[in-house]
Amino acid sequence: DIEATLEKTLHMSLEDFSRDFSLWLKEKYYPYLSDFDIEEYDIQITDRRKHGGYFNIAPDVSPAGDMLVFITDRNDYSDIYVSSITGRFQKKLISGNTRPDLENLHLLNAKLDFSPDGGRFAFVARGPGYDILYIADSRTGKIEKKFPFKGLDGIRYPAFSPDGRRIALVGLKDGKSDIYIFHLKSRHLERVTDDYFTDIYPTFDSRGNLYFASDRNEDIHRYGNYAIFRYDGASIERATPYMGKIHYLDMRNDEPVVALEYRNTINLFQVKGEKLIRITNVATGIHSFSFDRSGDVMAASMQLNGAREVVVYENPEPVDTLPIDSFTRGKFYHYRPMEYVSRKYKVSFSVDWIAGAGGYSTLYGGMGYLTLGMSDWTGDHWIIFSSDMYAQDISNMQFFIDYLYLKKRWDANLNVHQYWSIGFYDSLSYITFDKNLGAYMLLYYPFNRFDRLEIGTGYDYKTRYLYYWDGTYTGITVFQHEPFLYLGFSHDNALYYPWGPVNGSRFFAGAQGVPISTNRYAMVYADGRKYFRIARNYVFAFRLAGGRVFGEHAYDNPFIVGDVRGWNRNAVFFGNNFFVWNSEFRFPFIKELVLGFPPITLSYIRGALFFDMGYAWFDSEGFRFFSPDGSLASPKAAFGFSARWFIGFADVILDVAWRTNLRELLDPLKKPVYSLYFGLEY
């Protein structure tokens, strides 16, 4: 309790402490901030208050200085936008994070670079297991060329040569960060450096000399102090003294401009002979930047109003000049090889979480539940256990024991379980209560970040207690052996908020069969979902699902459908065939509801307009979609309104539904079907 702690230790309330601390910060830093220009830029390209997003980075100005490209998260994805130099025209060129060959844009090491003619730009994205160098049209975003770099662990910071025939980049391989030059026509990858020093930020001058930042020196055990180096095609020479940490590098009129720490923030300095000319004076730091061919237009990414924003400077003027020697206060760190003994890793488990509860009932006696999770130090092995039990009958307890092997690209799941379920028997002649004791093994193989194959096999031993439909026990018990096979495929590139997906798509298709049993059947099913976000909090959501059970005992293993709102409390549809269609328009309903009594505040209540339709049926029933008069025949449908309030782990959902056959309401308008429950958006 922070308030009680403050009262006891400092003898002041939280409110008084907050006020005094705020005054102390102002007294300490306001005089310091007066030495900086808070808003010295000329044009602000991005603004989180208008566009949304908090991370706008890697701006690159075209050689002509008339436009720029940058990476932004304004749509919650990492996208590449083009903008006029005034910021009035902006357009999305590349959508990131939604397909296997554009998994991510390496936001912590991102760089975009225009070709010399300004018609194209280069960028790097993560593909399915390797990095890809892209060249795209700077006005349409069309991908013109893509070069996978499967021989390297990663690539960063692409930079066009003045003739547009080569691209310099940083390549990562076996723990090394080295400079490479990629020849576009021949696809030859030329290695410029080959050592354990860190080489970053390659860029060309107009004569074709390659500049980059590096901590290379005569002692391989010293690192962390950077200088600018120049490669003329034959040899590498140091162009500046060591200057500590260099945060970025670009060229202006064939002179290096570096982002350096100065007075506890990061500003830009142009290297001119033996001098450093400071050309920015911001308090919050500049993290990446670029110049046009003339050097008169500069785009930069800086911290502004709580976000990383892109701004434009027009002909940035010198702020002051420092002797380069007086600035070289960086120091090397010395790596000292350590003596160690190598031992083979042994798997050892420790408990990560444990939860449980217990109680006593005069009807059942002692009862409780327990769940716990254990893993090894590397996270490659997991064991998860969950159970409930009743003291009077431990043999009928429910439990699940899972072992997860996560070391390889493919994952394995071994499971042993016992649980109870409700089913059917002898073509729906009886209702069954089944005790399922069994085990299974599943293998998961991800093709990429979005697509996965699942395959498995298992065995269930069912003890089936048969009941009549009125709930009377028949006295009959059936024992069934069910070995099964399973195959599934899933796709998911949806963007998730805490309460559910808001953009993208999800799809799953699976098949399961019991080939050798007294309960033989085969099942196929699919579920596809698509989300269209038309504005930040306004979403159209659609879902279509369906399936079919085949085989001798198809009627004993039906689908049970309850996803048609308005009908789910009044009827349960089951059969060996089913389909469900759900559609919603989701929107903010109440941003804040403040009640006088009880004194509570409900924040961000969301709303949705929905239409649902679906049904499940047996082959013997027959199925007809429409009646002769155009109304629904077999399917059931409803429309209505839904309100949702997220409480941290689930939504409290209130549905108001009117049932319809598409010609008329099946319920009076004033008597809809209400449902109140916990859940999440599909």
Language model regions located:
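Outer-membrane beta-barrel initiation region
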Residues: 308, 314-409, 413, 477-501, ...
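Transmembrane beta-strands of outer-membrane beta-barrel pores
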Residues: 216, 359-362, 376, 387-391, ...
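C-terminal outer-membrane beta-barrel translocator/porin domains of Gram-negative envelope proteins
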Residues: 427-430, 472-613, 617-619, 625-628, ...
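Conserved beta-propeller blade repeats
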Residues: 51-71, 89-90, 97-124, 143-170, ...
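Beta-propeller blade-edge and WD-like acidic-aromatic loop motif
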Residues: 34-40, 74-96, 119-120, 124-147, ...
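Feature captures outer-membrane beta-barrel proteins of Gram-negative bacteria and organelles
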Residues: 368-376, 397-416, 435-447, 483-493, ...
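Repeated loop/turn-to-beta-strand initiation elements of outer-membrane beta-barrel proteins
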Residues: 89, 188, 378-383, 407-414, ...
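Beta/coil-rich, acidic/histidine-enriched accessory regions frequently appended to metallopeptidases
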Residues: 2-103, 107-112, 138
